[in-house]
């Protein structure tokens, strides 16, 4: 649903990672094993949230995070992150990097980087409300694309144009046959 080759985010961008999936007893943050890691990038638009990008990554290593940022954010942008070591390579990759270490200080993460945390909260609430908490990991990338599409067009005044854009995108990407969605393969099962 997200247009291939779409424009990258520009200006000032907040980037952080969140975890999507069911609850795990006694585990928090980066200790989580069964949840999927989703990187969130939110464009700053004054006090509001501009466009967003979301992507599931295999881990929170510098390589995974930089791959996402190169794909989602135009070079030269200012990227605001927490103190996680995975973001240390941003200046070498042609990005300005603003770090706010959030570890037991007076300021909470959602106060320092409100846009990215609002998007993560809305995503989780949307998944819970729409899918009743039944997020199947093999479909998560499709859910993230749908959420991104809807979020980035939330203030659109041209509803007809929205449908036109959706139809354009539907015919410009490879089809996802029922068998590949249900069984994870393009071969029909008998």
Annotate each language-model stretch with its function:
Residues 1-190:
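Residue-level recognition of single "structural anchor" positions
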């Amino acid at each position: 649903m997200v247009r291939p080759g779409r424009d990258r985010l520009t200006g000032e961008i907040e980037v952080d990672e969140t975890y999507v999936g069911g609850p795990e007893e006694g585990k928090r943050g980066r200790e989580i094993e069964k949840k999927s890691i989703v990187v969130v990038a939110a464009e700053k638009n004054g006090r509001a949230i501009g466009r967003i990008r979301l992507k599931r990554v295999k881990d929170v290593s510098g390589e995974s995070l930089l791959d996402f940022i190169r794909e989602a954010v135009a070079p030269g942008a200012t990227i605001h992150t927490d103190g996680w070591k995975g973001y240390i390579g941003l200046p070498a990759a042609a990005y300005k990097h603003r770090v706010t270490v959030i570890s037991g200080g007076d300021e909470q993460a959602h106060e320092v980087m409100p846009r990215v945390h609002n998007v993560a909260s809305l995503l989780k609430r949307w998944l819970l409300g729409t899918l009743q908490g039944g997020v199947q990991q093999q479909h998560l990338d499709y859910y993230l694309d749908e959420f991104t599409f809807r979020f980035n067009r939330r203030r659109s005044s041209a509803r007809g144009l929205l449908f036109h854009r959706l139809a354009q995108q539907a015919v410009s990407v490879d089809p996802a046959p029922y068998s590949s969605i249900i069984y994870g393969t393009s071969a029909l099962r008998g």
